[in-house]
Amino acid sequence: GAGDRGDAAMVAYGASRYALSKGDKAEAEKLWPLIEWCLEYCRRNLNESGVVASDADELENRFPAGKANLCTSSLYYDALISAGYLGKDLGKPVAAYARQATALKKNIDRYFGGTVEGFDTYKYYEGNDVLRSWICIPLTVGIQDRKDATIQALFSPRLWTENGLLTQAGSETFWDRSTLYALRGVYACGETEKATDYLRFYSSQRLLGEHVPYAIEAWPEGNQRHLSAESGLYCRIITEGMFGIRPTGLNSFVFTPRLPQEWDHMNLRKICAFNQVFDIEVKRLGDQLQVAVIADGKTISNRKIKEGENIRIKF
């Protein structure tokens, strides 16, 4: 195959978030050994700079990824945080994961942070001097140290096109997955208006344009075929970006709603997560937001918050 694409980081990231969101303790117990193994695999593959070594990424050498890439370490970072939440609810010893996450966050900035094409953002790998679309990935895992320059770079003419983000500046190749991650990350950073403008543009192009009605995988490879994973990533722009939902336990989450200025309300209904079915309703009240969480006809929380404030929910 393509070698180590950072699969262990991907599995740990996805499985821990899935287990938390599902809210099924028995299923989480079954997944725990897999998550633990993947985290340990990543730890054993840390290089001398404290980031994860991998000889490829999900693009499988279509574009250079060096000996350690930003994507793998960012996913590992988020996986450590999610595993900390999950392990706590399962009664597992998880203190080491928090320490490892703190160290990794510093190492990511030290190793990957730098100026690329005039933007104080991230090198995708050591020696990378051309902007890459995956500089968006830290924004999706709560790493915002370089958010301003990173967002400027993402939406600069070097990367942004009528088809979303180019995989690499100067190329003609685009894979929708990085555009979909980027839009989620820009919402997560609180750049709501910018994210909404570009989400509207992307949606009219992809979902309502000539090649419809789904997000696509790539071009020119595969001739813009539709894959379900990209449509899932589109949904995550809404759930994790616009509504800012972040699981913190098998029956708890934190969320930060990002209501676009020209909207007076937004609702997300019949959310099936944390072993519940619930709604989130957000209304604009002057310079504040009225935010309600309703499950089984009962109001779990109803609060006024400032823009950018988060709300913690425990069922």
Regions found by a protein language model. Name each.
Residues 1-5, 17-18:
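Aromatic/His-enriched, Gly/Pro-containing loop or helix-boundary segments
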Residues 8, 29, 33-36, 40, ...:
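Active-site core of glycosidic bond-cleaving carbohydrate-active enzymes
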Residues 38-49:
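Short, positively charged
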Residues 188-315:
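Non-catalytic C-terminal accessory modules of carbohydrate-active enzymes
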Residues 56-61:
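A short, charged helix-loop
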Residues 107-112:
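Short amphipathic coiled-coil heptad-repeat segments
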